[in-house]
Amino acid sequence: DKKEEGKYHPRIGVQRDFIFRSLSEAEKNAFNKLYDQYYYHRHNDFWRQQAMKKLPQLTQSTRMLVCGEDLGMIPDCVSSVMNDLRILSLEIQRMPKNPMYEFGYLNEYPYRSVCTISTHDMSTLRGWWEEDYLQTQRYYNTMLGHYGTAPTVATPDLCEEVVRNHLKSNSI
């Protein structure tokens, strides 16, 4: 804290900051344990209690299927709470939940999920296609199974193929 020396505040993604890189390996390991505990475990019971107090009223107030945006950094309890309340998971191929994958595999999505190409705070399919040519080239070859050079623009036929593949996913 710049105003109060000796005070520290948790910050998401601090591992990419210059100050983190200046730490020794032992300090980095200790920091990462604290970071993981704070962001993923410390508040887990609190989040579960709050969810179970508020969400049942919402999910039971309608006959619609409810979908949760379970993307990014989420507490460990989110998956079990969503399962207990029968809330559908959100799956986005270019934002896979498995950090080992660059893209999600549509055939691995759970049945109780919604599979979509993007969300309200992401670029459209055509916009994404033009953002990072190397990434779209990998998508074109690995996910769509095409050989050769990917088109630089997402053509209507290409977009239709991507949408068709999403519609064939395991998701509801």
Give the location of each predicted region.
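Catalytic cores of glycan-processing enzymes that make or break glycosidic bonds
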Residues: D1-I172
